[in-house]
Amino acid sequence: MESNLSGLVPAAGLVPALPPTVTLGLTAAYTALYALLFFSVYAQLWLVLLYGHKRLSYQTVFLALCLLWAALRTTLFSFYFRDTPRANRLGPLPFWLLYCCPVCLQFFTLTLMNLYFVQVVFKAKAKRRPEMSRGLLAVRGAFVGASLLFLLVNVLCAVLSRQRQAQPWVLLLVRVLVSDSLFVICALSLAACLCLVARRAPSTSIYLEAKGTSVCQAAAIGGAMVLLYASRACYNLAALALAPRSRLDAFDYDWYNVSDQADLVNDLGNKGYLVFGLILFVWELLPTTLLVGFFRVHRPPQDLSTSRILNGQVFGSRSYFFDRAGHCEDEGCSWEHSRSESTSMSGSLGSGSWYGAIGREPGWGGASQTRTTPLLFSQVPGPGSHHHSLYSTPQT
């Protein structure tokens, strides 16, 4: 590697871009940020067990991916305290785990975000169009296929790069084109899902609020993810197109594979290391932190007086994420229907009559009968009717 560097850059004119103390401080700051995120996600996973949430859900899968991602990034930056040369001479598997796998994990979190909002949209439409359930399976298969393609391309490029079996320019071109194109496609699909969620706000808001968020919060987080991931992909594609083939290591366009730049730290100074850290903060740490906050574990509602009744089931005003997937199958019309029935029931009870009591005869006691039939007898019970108490919504 030293011969390659000597042919590219003359060693006589090189001076450190940053003092050693600043470099050490940057390394400590990077490591501390990723370690803090690691312990935060680790605590969230323990809260899942403590609160008795579902162990396999969108939330737990996302948190597990973020935990692995933060652990790999923390391990990578820990090398830069004293053992930078060792980090640059890793075998194919450790090289891929530390440098390439975190990007794959980030793409998986983006597809997971897409799948969640696609599920929200499909569940809102499934009430009137039951065949939409088959479309949801097709969309899930498409995102799984995209994830596998992303993983396969990155693994092959990492192995070929370490074994020197292909030209570096060809490997970079293939990886950047495939990976960043998939990032852009997933970002655009996320934007489309957010538009559909916003258009169907009355029906989708019930599902989102039952999971501990709202349409505005989901749109804000999703919009930020679209901007961050799309800008990252555009940056990589533009920098690769503008970089000359004879000087692949001139700038940190390949920022998610820092091994192309890490072996230049001692020779070119630390300017590239500073740029790499800033880019990782904006395009890796920031979006992951936002998503961790979005998928955070909520405490189950304790006070039933602040809960709402929806189709015979109790929902807190801030119930937790992704733990009751079947609660809001019937949004929209069912919610409005149950709310109108609850209003009628409360009006009948508030008039002084016992729930289910038969109205008095007209003219009884000199007063005219103006009340309507109580709610209990407003509908003819079907063969599948259930007993309804004051705390359950009538099932139709």
Curated annotation (Swiss-Prot):
Function statement: Lysosomal integral membrane protein that may regulate MTORC1 complex translocation to lysosomes. May play a role in autophagy.
Its membrane topology: Multi-pass membrane protein
InterPro entries: GPR137
Organism: Mus musculus
Protein name: Integral membrane protein GPR137
Keyword Cytoplasm: no
Compartments it resides in: Lysosome membrane
Keywords for this protein: Autophagy, Glycoprotein, Lysosome, Membrane, Transmembrane, Transmembrane helix
